[in-house]
């Protein structure tokens, strides 16, 4: 078992220049840090180089050299003028690394399936949105032709917004969200693009309120969770069985555990595959820290001490259960702190309003369960707190590596510096974080609960830093 102590960097242990070098790309791109590029909706995405592995399926040798090289500009893709106008309006200047490799494959004819692994903030959403917009016949504004599935209503609404933003000049583009309470029983689905959650989509098809006969493309975001048999795998299989057999299937996620990848290859047969090296999966630009709490009861006291730092930007506190989220909200509000809690027990419209308040900055501290761990983009988030270490399996005995990665990916987005702080208090939580650190090769910065001035200084240095360097580690001499 890995020892967490061996993965810890105390703030004063290393010189300021001891920053992990960015991995070198092996797909023909230059080394170093890229200029900021836009991800389609949010500006300022910074991409460090990473190794992109491309596995082509069923192509002739002459085709492989072209598709491996990717594209250097959107103009090379032959997109419709209305789509290009949307890209220009969003100041979307050049493809990101994942877009360079994935878009030529996804847009090729005849359509081919794709399994794409790409970490948060690399432009994966814009990649599949461009493909969807290119497949839709806009002369049929009420005929469903594209289906996108997401694990939560929050992510479905976000994807809907991205499609509408990039497709703002696409005449007759209609995008509906198939989430609980959103589709009228009288009219059913009346849009050419549908974004929804699997359960609602399945119900609409069964009630014959969703005509799937002319669907051309299906996208599953956060596919590792959606296809996991402990998650929504059964629902996704049933939905797929209701769709045309020749539908193009695109699977996207930041992580693909091996057991899920095996199933994904059966779900999206003969698919091209694009993925990052295992060592490139941790999110760049996030300083990952660790707080050894004296006991479980002290976690709350330390959380309250962090409140002043949480409100420099926006912060997300991840807890294990809905009950914990509500209880921490109650206690913090009683202590005079302004916080919100969002979890699955809230009604749909209430959840929408809570997330909208958080996005707009009206609410700056959000307590939540894993419902927000995946895919949600709020660019102002500067801190993520793992109040409870993510666990999985019977009795929560195993650390959940993938959920840890998704959680911390809510900060450090679009070129900004972010901080994640994980609380441990006993042997189980200590060992769990130790295994996560060992799995991703993390050097965690230790924060001292008994030296609050030093802790506060170090966290502030990162949050307020304008350097935005990958893997930034605070140092006593780093001002």
From Swiss-Prot:
Associates with the nuclear pore complex. A motif (DEAD box) lies at residues 221-224. It comes from Chaetomium globosum (strain ATCC 6205 / CBS 148.51 / DSM 1962 / NBRC 6347 / NRRL 1970). Residues 285-463 form the Helicase C-terminal domain. It catalyses: ATP + H2O = ADP + phosphate + H(+). Belongs to the DEAD box helicase family. DDX19/DBP5 subfamily. Residues 1-41 are annotated as: Disordered. Pfam families: DEAD, Helicase_C. This is ATP-dependent RNA helicase DBP5. Residues 105-274 form the Helicase ATP-binding domain. Keywords: ATP-binding, Cytoplasm, Helicase, Hydrolase, Membrane, mRNA transport, Nuclear pore complex, Nucleotide-binding, Nucleus, Protein transport, RNA-binding, Translocation, Transport. Residues 17-28 have a biased composition (Low complexity). One of its GO terms (biological process) is poly(A)+ mRNA export from nucleus. ATP-dependent RNA helicase associated with the nuclear pore complex and essential for mRNA export from the nucleus. May participate in a terminal step of mRNA export through the removal of proteins that accompany mRNA through the nucleopore complex. May also be involved in early transcription. The Q motif is unique to and characteristic of the DEAD box family of RNA helicases and controls ATP binding and hydrolysis. ATP binds at residues 118-125. Its EC number is 3.6.4.13. It is found in: Cytoplasm; Nucleus, Nuclear pore complex; Nucleus membrane. PROSITE patterns: DEAD_ATP_HELICASE (PS00039), HELICASE_ATP_BIND_1 (PS51192), HELICASE_CTER (PS51194), Q_MOTIF (PS51195). InterPro entries: DEAD/DEAH_box_helicase_dom, Helicase_ATP-bd, Helicase_C-like, P-loop_NTPase, RNA-helicase_DEAD-box_CS, RNA_helicase_DEAD_Q_motif. A motif (Q motif) lies at residues 72-100. GO terms for molecular function: ATP binding; ATP hydrolysis activity; inositol hexakisphosphate binding; RNA binding; RNA helicase activity. It is a peripheral membrane protein.
């Amino acid at each position: 078992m890995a020892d967490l102590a061996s993965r810890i960097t105390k703030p004063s242990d290393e010189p300021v220049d001891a920053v992990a070098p960015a991995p070198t790309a092996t797909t023909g791109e230059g080394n170093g840090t890229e200029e900021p590029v836009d991800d389609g909706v949010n500006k300022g995405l910074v991409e460090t180089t990473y190794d992109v592995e491309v596995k082509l399926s069923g192509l002739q040798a002459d085709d492989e050299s072209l598709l491996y090289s990717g594209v250097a500009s959107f103009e090379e893709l032959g997109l419709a003028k209305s789509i290009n106008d949307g890209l220009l309006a969003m100041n979307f200047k050049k493809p990101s690394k994942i877009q360079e490799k994935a878009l030529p494959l996804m847009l090729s004819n005849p359509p081919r399936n794709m399994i794409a692994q790409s970490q948060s903030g690399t432009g994966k959403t814009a990649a599949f949105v461009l493909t969807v917009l290119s497949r839709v016949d806009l002369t049929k504004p009420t005929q469903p032709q594209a289906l996108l599935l997401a694990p939560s209503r929050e992510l479905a609404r976000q994807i809907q917004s991205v499609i509408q933003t990039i497709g703002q000049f696409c005449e007759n583009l209609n995008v509906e969200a198939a989430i609980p309470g959103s589709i009228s029983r009288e009219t059913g689905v009346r849009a050419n693009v549908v974004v929804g959650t699997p359960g609602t989509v399945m119900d609409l098809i069964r009630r014959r309120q969703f005509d799937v006969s002319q669907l051309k493309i299906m996208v599953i975001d956060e596919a590792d969770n959606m296809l996991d048999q402990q998650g929504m795998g059964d629902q996704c299989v049933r939905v797929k069985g209701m769709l045309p057999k020749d539908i193009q299937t695109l699977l996207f996620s930041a992580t693909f555990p091996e057991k899920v990848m095996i199933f994904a290859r059966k779900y999206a047969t003969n698919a091209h595959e694009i993925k990052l090296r295992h060592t490139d999966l941790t999110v760049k630009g996030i300083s990952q820290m660790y707080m050894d709490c004296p006991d479980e009861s002290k976690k709350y006291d330390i959380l309250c001490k962090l409140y002043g730092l949480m409100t420099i930007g926006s912060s997300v506190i991840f807890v294990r259960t809905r009950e914990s989220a509500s209880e921490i909200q109650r206690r913090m509000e009683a202590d005079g702190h302004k916080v919100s809690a969002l979890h699955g027990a809230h009604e749909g419209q209430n959840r929408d309003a809570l997330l909208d308040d958080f996005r707009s900055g009206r609410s700056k501290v959000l307590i939540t369960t894993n419902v927000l761990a995946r895919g949600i983009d709020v660019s102002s988030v500067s801190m993520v707190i793992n109040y409870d270490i993510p666990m999985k399996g019977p009795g929560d005995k195993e650390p959940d590596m993938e959920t840890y990665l998704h959680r911390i990916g809510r900060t450090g987005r679009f070129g900004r510096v972010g901080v994640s702080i994980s609380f441990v208090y006993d042997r189980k939580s200590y060992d769990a974080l130790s295994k996560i650190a060992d799995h991703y090769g993390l050097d965690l910065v230790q924060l001292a609960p008994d030296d609050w001035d030093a802790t506060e200084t170090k966290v502030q240095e990162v949050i307020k830093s304008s350097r935005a360097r990958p893997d930034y580690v605070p140092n006593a001499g780093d001002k």
